[in-house]
Amino acid sequence: MPGLALYDFGDSIRFGANSCAEDDDNYDKVELMLDYFEAYAKGFLSEAGDALNQCEIDNLAFSAKLMTFECGMRFLTDYLNGDTYFKTAYPEHNLVRAKNQFALVADMERKMEQMQQIIKSITE
């Protein structure tokens, strides 16, 4: 099944540009590391940029927030359903993961303009 570049980019940022592990419960420390975002975006666009259309390029920053929110919802849903999908190490593990992802989404919302500017500076 073919994938979507926005999903791949967004999930990579969700995991790779988070200042904390996805199950760190110190939510005040969770933030998007813009230098990691920029480095990944440069590499991604240098290799895949020619295969992307303008709409995809315009939505790269948003895709990071979308995939982070989606993963947070999946962790929360799994927690509410009795932890049947994701492997957990302790009873509230998926709840901690969800809160971590939602903290990252909140930081991405604060930094969205900067994220979009980074993409724009790379593609111009």
Residue locations for each model-derived region?
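Small/polar glycine-rich anion-binding or flexible loop at a beta-alpha turn
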Residues: 57-67
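Active-site activation/catalytic loop segments of kinase-like enzymes and analogous catalytic loops
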Residues: 6-50, 66-85
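Alpha-helical transmembrane segments
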Residues: 49-58
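Short acidic, Gly/Ser-rich segments with clustered Asp/Glu that frequently serve as metal-coordination loops
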Residues: 1-2
